[in-house]
C-alpha cells in the first residue's frame, strides 16, 4: 500500500511561506502544522514573523504559542506532536500542511531521532557559567579535544551547538560524532510519504535584500521593545533557546550594552542570512523536492499549482 502523502511547504527565511500558506488555505480545507522553533514561544511575535490574529482566523494553525520563553521544546516533542496532529486532522476530514523553516524538525519527523542523551539543566547551567567567564571560543577549544569531528564543523561562537556537544560528551561518555554514526533509536517508522514544496531563490542577492528589508520592518514594528520586555524578566538569559533565536540574541546584546543598535541590526541581518544558507543547504538534499522560485512574481500561483499536483486524487 502506498503511504499517504504529506505536503511540506518549506524554504529559507523571507521566502514568502506565509503568503503561500494563506493562498493554499483558500483552495483546500487545510490545517497548518507550524514547523518553526521560534514561533512556539509566547510573547515573541515580531521577531519571529508569527502569523497575525487575522491570518490565524483564515486557517487553523497548530504549534504556535505553546511554550513560555523560559521553557524548551525538543525535536522529539515536535515529532510526537506533529504525528498526533496529522492523525487528528485527517480524522476531521481535512488536509494537514507542514509549513516552516526549522529543518531539524523536518528531519526528526521524516527519519526519527538519534539515541542521544536528554538535556541536563544543571549541566547546561554549568557550561553557560563557564562560557560567561571564558567565552564560547574557549569551550569550542575544549570540544576540539573531546570531539574533533564535531568541533571542526562548528563556529567557535556557535554557543547552542557547542553546549549541546559538550553536554553529550559528559553525559554519554563518548563524542557526539561517534553516537551519530551508531544505530538510530527505535522510533516507529513514519507511516507517511513527505513531499516538499521548496520555496527557493533564483538569485541569492535578492533574497539577502529581502532579509534586510524584513529585519528593518521588524525594527520599525517594535522588535527592540518586544525584546526589552523579555530582557526585563529575571528568569530569562542568553543561554535559553528562545533568547538565542535570530534577532533576539542580537537585540539582547544591545540591551545588555555590549553593542550599539546599528551593530545589533547588522549582526541580526548577517545571522538571518546565515540561517537562510543553512536552510537551503538542507533543502537541496531532500528527495521529492518540488522547487518553486520564491522571487517570481507568480510564486504564490506556482505554489498552488504544485500543491494540486502533489496531492493525491
Curated annotation (Swiss-Prot):
**Gene Ontology BP terms:** tRNA modification
Q: Where is this site: Interaction with substrate tRNA?
A: 102, 124
The coenzyme or cofactor needed here is: Mg(2+)
Q: Where is this region: Interaction with substrate tRNA?
A: 36-39, 160-164, 244-249
Q: Does the keyword Nuclease apply?
A: no
**Record-annotated residues binding substrate?**
13-18
Q: Which domain of life is it from?
A: Bacteria
Task: Could you list this entry's UniProt keywords, alphabetically sorted.
Answer: ATP-binding, Magnesium, Nucleotide-binding, Transferase, tRNA processing
Kindly list the positions annotated as binding ATP. Answer: 11-18
User: What function is annotated for this protein?
Assistant: Catalyzes the transfer of a dimethylallyl group onto the adenine at position 37 in tRNAs that read codons beginning with uridine, leading to the formation of N6-(dimethylallyl)adenosine (i(6)A).
Query: What is its quaternary makeup?
Result: Monomer.
**Which family is this sequence assigned to?**
Belongs to the IPP transferase family.
Q: This chain belongs to which protein, by name?
A: tRNA dimethylallyltransferase
Identify the species of origin. Answer: Bordetella pertussis (strain Tohama I / ATCC BAA-589 / NCTC 13251)
Amino acid at each position: 500500500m502506498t503511504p499517504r502523502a504529506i505536503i511540506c511547504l518549506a524554504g529559507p527565511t523571507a521566502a514568502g511561506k506565509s503568503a503561500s500558506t494563506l493562498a493554499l488555505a483558500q483552495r483546500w480545507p487545510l490545517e497548518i502544522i507550524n514547523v518553526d522553533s521560534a514561533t512556539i514561544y509566547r510573547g515573541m511575535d515580531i521577531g519571529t514573523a508569527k502569523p497575525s490574529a487575522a491570518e490565524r482566523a483564515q486557517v487553523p494553525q497548530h504549534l504556535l504559542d505553546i511554550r513560555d520563553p523560559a521553557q524548551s521544546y525538543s525535536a522529539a516533542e515536535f515529532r510526537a506532536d506533529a504525528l498526533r496532529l496529522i492523525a487528528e486532522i485527517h480524522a476531521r476530514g481535512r488536509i494537514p500542511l507542514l509549513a516552516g523553516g526549522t529543518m531539524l524538525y523536518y528531519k526528526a519527523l521524516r527519519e526519527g531521532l538519534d539515541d542521544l542523551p536528554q538535556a541536563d539543566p544543571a549541566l547546561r547551567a554549568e557550561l553557560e557559567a563557564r562560557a560567561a567567564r571564558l567565552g564560547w571560543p574557549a569551550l569550542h577549544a575544549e570540544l576540539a579535544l573531546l570531539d574533533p569531528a564535531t568541533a571542526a564543523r562548528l563556529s567557535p561562537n556557535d554557543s547552542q551547538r557547542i553546549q549541546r556537544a559538550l553536554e553529550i560528551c559528559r553525559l554519554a561518555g563518548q563524542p557526539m560524532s561517534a553516537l551519530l554514526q551508531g544505530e538510530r533509536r527505535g522510533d516507529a517508522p513514519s507511516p507517511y510519504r513527505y513531499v516538499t514544496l521548496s520555496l527557493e531563490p533564483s538569485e541569492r542577492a535578492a533574497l539577502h535584500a529581502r532579509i534586510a528589508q524584513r529585519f528593518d520592518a521588524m525594527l520599525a514594528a517594535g522588535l527592540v521593545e518586544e525584546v526589552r520586555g523579555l530582557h526585563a524578566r529575571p528568569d530569562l538569559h542568553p543561554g535559553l533557546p528562545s533568547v538565542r533565536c535570530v534577532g533576539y540574541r542580537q537585540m539582547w546584546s544591545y540591551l545588555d550594552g555590549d553593542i550599539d543598535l546599528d551593530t545589533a541590526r547588522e549582526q541580526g541581518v548577517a545571522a538571518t542570512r546565515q540561517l537562510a544558507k543553512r536552510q537551503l543547504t538542507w533543502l537541496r538534499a531532500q528527495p521529492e523536492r518540488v522547487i518553486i522560485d520564491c522571487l517570481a512574481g507568480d510564486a504564490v500561483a506556482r505554489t498552488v499549482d504544485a500543491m494540486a499536483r502533489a496531492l493525491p486524487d
